[in-house]
Design a protein with these regions (language model features):
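Long, low-complexity, intrinsically disordered terminal regions
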Residues: 1-567
Length: 567
């Protein structure tokens, strides 16, 4: 970017450098350019914005420790700090042991997974693959196309290989070589909005009157500015399921399988099922119609005034617990408690819970759920009471309102509320004589519910996944409310099962799938709109007496609203 030299800079700074690039210190839509030679970078500033994918990767890589290394460093810290010599602790009668606390735990048996033709997927160490198996419910993709925003990818070759890999997994994809749309070279220097709009004009011309059922989108890089605008165009404006990819230079079969896992789930298929789903052997859940909610709130970076995004994910098709849908809303910045679970407007409810219940009825022959299980992420212990008095109350009101509209006020479901926490410092280490696995982490399926848990309330720790790098961090589950009446064993089995139904992966995950899906749904829909612009709008109202209105996100098109678009 060139800058115009003023007389001041001619006299005070380098007169022979008019072509140096400038530093943009303004907003994306209001740039402010400063000459580089007059700027200084102040050291030791805290960076508050989101890190890039590469930065996050380097941060995690630099901070991870293998279990034995972490255990040794903790032992060394206890010894070197000599907490027992602290006068205040001694005065209070508090002593800190230098040895790790021994606690009892048990390892749950991994649930059985089924692929096509009732073949069992082998799950050693919480991992499996589809090398010789097909997806249990593969989809047919008839009308679809591919869009290329990247100059480095041979999209036609990618499409050909994807179709071949799909055949191996049971997915029937028609050849769309004629419907590969390349971005015109001259558009690469335009704004992301113009680039997306131009490509969609080509799509309309290519498909004439028939809307494609699926679009594969090849992006030039991760975290591309095109991503959010493309998703909004497809999901909100046109109702087209889409999968964005940034293919590596050397595309391997496993990469294609991972892409197909997402495509199949987004288009309504299922990759695998728990055997006890189909045999109705999940304790309590398989005995009565049950809906499972996953709820999460995504916030902007610290210090920003960006609206928070709340997502509610709910299960479809009882007795299955593997298929979900999502609803998303914005709310006040940094607010953790979800606002729009129940929102009565006149004689109607426009809240998140109603949308979930309607889709559940449509997939259960009009029968309402008798049991509602709620998994909530992202709240601290100081907010537990607010979850019960605010969120559970709103969900109860939404169900009561829904029951009065559809079932004559004679529907009274039972509720169970469970909080999942990952942001804690508890770690488990195997005793030395039992360090037999490759990285010395606890085995997947490890549960601890004694010794370090609350003396009165019901909580437990679970390591459902296999920690292959670094030290496994368990998820801490707190049961705040339980009308259904789960026994500890039954609830732990349900949580363990829900760690194996994450359709976009072939590994057990560290937290139940509904919560992971809620996180993905909030993050993806938030990118529909430039939230930086929302932040500026909110800031412009900050000095006014009345609070700034929270901008709403675009609603999903009806054709994709019930899909697993977030997968």
């Amino acid at each position: 970017m060139l800058y115009q030299r003023l007389a001041y800079y001619n006299m005070q700074w380098y007169a022979g450098s008019p072509h140096l690039r400038c530093l943009n210190v303004g907003k994306p839509d209001r740039p402010t350019y400063l000459p580089l030679e007059v700027c200084q970078l102040v050291p030791l500033q805290r960076y508050k914005k989101s890190l890039s994918t590469m930065q996050r990767s380097k941060l995690v890589e630099g901070s991870r420790q293998k279990p034995l290394d972490r255990k040794l460093s903790l032992s060394r810290a206890l010894r070197d700090n000599n907490y027992d010599s602290e006068p205040m602790l001694r005065e209070c009668g508090i002593s800190i042991a230098r040895e790790f606390m021994q606690v009892e735990g048990r390892v749950l048996q991994a649930p059985q997974l089924s692929a096509a033709r009732d073949r069992e997927l082998y799950t050693p160490n919480g991992r499996w693959n589809f090398n010789k198996d097909r997806f249990i419910q593969p989809i047919k993709v008839k009308t679809w196309g591919a869009v290329n925003f990247s100059a480095r990818c041979n999209v036609r070759d990618l499409v050909k290989r994807l179709i071949q890999a799909g055949i191996m997994k049971g997915i029937q994809m028609e050849d769309c070589a004629a419907d590969v749309i390349e971005e015109m070279h001259q558009m690469k220097w335009e704004t992301p909005a113009k680039r997306v709009e131009d490509v969609f004009q080509q799509i309309k011309s290519s498909f004439k009157q028939q809307k494609p059922g699926f679009l594969l989108c090849v992006l030039p890089e991760k975290n591309s500015d095109i991503y959010g605008l493309w998703k909004r165009k497809c999901l909100a404006e046109h109702g087209i399921v889409t999968q964005c990819v940034v293919p590596p230079a050397n595309i391997k079969d496993q990469y294609l399988t991972n892409v197909l896992l997402k495509i199949n789930a987004k288009l309504g298929g299922l990759n695998s099922l728990l055997k006890n789903e189909t045999t109705r052997a999940i304790p309590l859940v398989s005995k009565a119609q049950t809906i499972i909610f996953g709820m999460d709130v995504s916030h902007g970076s610290p210090g920003s005034n960006v609206p928070s995004v709340a997502a509610v994910v709910s299960s479809l098709g009882w007795p299955l617990i593997s298929k979900y849908r999502a609803s998303v809303r914005t709310q006040a910045p940094r607010k953790e408690i979800i606002d729009y679970l129940f929102k009565q407007v006149g004689d109607d409810d426009q809240g998140l819970i109603k949308e979930s219940l309607i889709d559940f009825l449509n997939n259960s022959k009009g029968q309402p759920p008798e049991q509602i299980i709620i998994f909530r992420d992202g709240v601290s212990e100081g907010q537990f009471n607010m979850v019960l008095t605010d969120e559970l109350t709103k969900i109860t009101e939404a169900c009561k309102f829904f029951g009065s509209k559809h079932f004559g006020g004679k529907w009274f479901p039972k509720f169970t509320v469970i909080i999942a926490q990952k942001n804690h410092h508890t770690r488990f280490f195997l005793p030395n004589e039992r360090n037999r696995n490759e990285v010395n982490n606890v085995q997947p399926g490890t549960v601890v519910d004694k010794g370090i848990c609350h003396p009165r309330n019901y909580d437990f720790y679970m390591c459902a996944h296999a920690g292959m790098i670094g030290t496994t961090r368990p998820t801490h589950y707190h049961v705040l409310h339980d009308d259904i009446g789960f026994s500890p064993d039954d609830l732990q089995e349900l949580v363990h099962n829900l760690s194996y139904v994450y359709q976009r992966s072939t590994t057990a995950i560290s937290i139940v799938a509904p919560i992971y899906y809620a996180h993905h749904a909030a993050a993806q829909v938030a990118k529909f709109t430039r939230l930086d612009d929302m932040s500026e709008t909110s800031s412009s109202h900050a000095s006014q007496a009345e609070p700034a209105p929270v901008p709403e996100l675009p609603r999903l098109h009806p054709d994709v609203a019930s899909s697993m678009f977030f997968c």
